[in-house]
Swiss-Prot record:
Binding site for L-tyrosine: 34, 168, 172
SMART domains with a match to the protein in the record: S4
Descriptive protein name: Tyrosine--tRNA ligase 2
List of residues binding ATP: 233
Gene (name only): tyrS2
GO terms, molecular function: ATP binding; RNA binding; tyrosine-tRNA ligase activity
Amino acid sequence: MNIIDELEWRGAVNQQTDEEGLRKLVEEKKISLYCGVDPTGDSMHIGHLIPFMMMKRFQLAGHHPVILIGGATGTIGDPSGRQSERQLQTLEVVQHNVDALTAQMKKLFDFGGNSEVKMVNNYDWTHEINIIEFLRDYGKNFSINSMLAKDIVASRLDTGISFTEFTYQILQAMDFHHLYTKEDVQLQIGGSDQWGNITSGLDLIRKLEGHEAKVFGLTIPLLLKSDGTKFGKSAGGAVWLDPEKTTPFEFYQFWVNTDDRDVVKYLKYFTFLTKERIDELAVKVETEPHKREAQKVLAEEMTKFVHGEEALLQAVKITAALFSGDIKSLTADEIEQGFKEMPTFQSSKETKNIVEWLVDLGIEPSRRQAREDINNGAISMNGEKVTDVGTDVTVENSFDGRFIIIRKGKKNYSLVKLG
């Protein structure tokens, strides 16, 4: 299957500037292509992954991805998809974010071998251009009329857009031109909101290098969930690639909780599984939805891709322990991951009677209720039922001197931090 055919089968193509020309080009040779991300934060979220998964597919097909980190454009702010002006960040914050995103990209891509990936920062060539050069060499090639007609600008005319953000499309066009002349990049990939910026780059290259220049643009559809909401958010907000912001367990859970109506689409979009394997899983969704095999495979593939094999095994272990209620085998670090979103209480490390302890923490409303729940077998500590109201809670009951897990009833877990 041709790479373009595969992308279309996966539902990953929204618009192309010249489908026939691009298809012919990738059949004739291995091309260089690029996609950029601005360092507006110190971590990407799963929404950012979508174009870079496409870049990875090109890499696996033998093509040469160039990943651009927008050290320059990140100081300006992309107006695409926004109703208001971005807050400008200091150069120090931008550089911190550049370093963080660079580290994340290095985990996702193989920076060696026959299909080497390059990482570039547009600050390296942009910061040397003075204002006169910018206006004469680049600004002269842009019509205000066409810039105003771009959706990214037109959508902001009523609310207002600064000259800074207005010129963003020129800076991105300069990036494409630079990479075309220096790295032989012929294709830019981006989200559906980047169409205007991409076509600005194509126009600039043809004006400066001649209309015979073979350059192309391709955008990816906006990914929506079956309920019509935008993909990429959980109940707790964005799902980040940084394990400090979204733990591997939470990351795994996001995917494993995918709706049956969405899971096949996500398998096509995000995994590198074959068409045959995805078709098999699609049948399972229809015939055995209760087993949620497709969701488990999706969660495993994505967690392994982003966080690695060890983190995946840990996430699966935590999931199994929570499902069974047998949490004794978990480490303190695994407890911290698995119970991060549970009600959390603070306790000293001094020895205390279980009844007094539960009431003091606020897990139980009264001593009478605490005694009643214990006598009825409704209270478990670290996976074991508490049957004696005279039980003392000591630091020895904890995971590594850090945590105690209380379960009240079948599903009401609480995390108690000792300190």
